[in-house]
Amino acid sequence: MARIAGVDLPKKKRVEYALTYIYGIGLKSSQDILKAVNISFDKRVSDLSEDEVSSIAKKIQESYMVEGDLRKKVTMDIKSLMDLGSYRGLRHRKGLPVRGQTTKNNARTRKGKKKTVGSK
């Protein structure tokens, strides 16, 4: 099993789809990586040689921010928005939708379980 950026890639999948198991790499990025290192998209992970795996890993390391570093950057970006006191930061802090969605009826995913306010 090939291990790139701390992620075990599934053996039976095609390389272009297996690379998407790495956080921060989507289908387009994986295709760009494979083009850069001259590896066929149709190749399976189990058919990759050690040289090919190392060339993919090197390309990812020098060109992309993935896994822990990317997660840390996203978290720090959200934290900085909250520290600045921007509108987006306030919405993050309150656990409400950030991108302008209405909250009158929906937004249950962000708001959590319904809290019923009873009346007498």
UniProtKB/Swiss-Prot annotation:
One of its GO terms (molecular function) is structural constituent of ribosome. Residues 92-120 are annotated as: Disordered. One of its GO terms (cellular component) is cytosol. InterPro entries: Rbsml_uS13_C (IPR027437), Ribosomal_uS13 (IPR001892), Ribosomal_uS13-like_H2TH (IPR010979), Ribosomal_uS13_bac-type (IPR019980), Ribosomal_uS13_CS (IPR018269). Residues 107-120 have a biased composition (Basic residues). Disulfide bonds: none annotated. Keywords: Ribonucleoprotein, Ribosomal protein, RNA-binding, rRNA-binding, tRNA-binding. SUPFAM superfamilies: S13-like H2TH domain. PROSITE patterns: RIBOSOMAL_S13_1, RIBOSOMAL_S13_2. The keyword Ribonucleoprotein applies. GO terms for biological process: translation. PANTHER family: 30S RIBOSOMAL PROTEIN S13/40S RIBOSOMAL PROTEIN S18 (PTHR10871), SMALL RIBOSOMAL SUBUNIT PROTEIN US13M (PTHR10871:SF1). Located at the top of the head of the 30S subunit, it contacts several helices of the 16S rRNA. In the 70S ribosome it contacts the 23S rRNA (bridge B1a) and protein L5 of the 50S subunit (bridge B1b), connecting the 2 subunits; these bridges are implicated in subunit movement. Contacts the tRNAs in the A and P-sites. Belongs to the universal ribosomal protein uS13 family. Part of the 30S ribosomal subunit. Forms a loose heterodimer with protein S19. Forms two bridges to the 50S subunit in the 70S ribosome. HAMAP family: Ribosomal_uS13 (MF_01315). This is Small ribosomal subunit protein uS13. It comes from Helicobacter hepaticus (strain ATCC 51449 / 3B1).
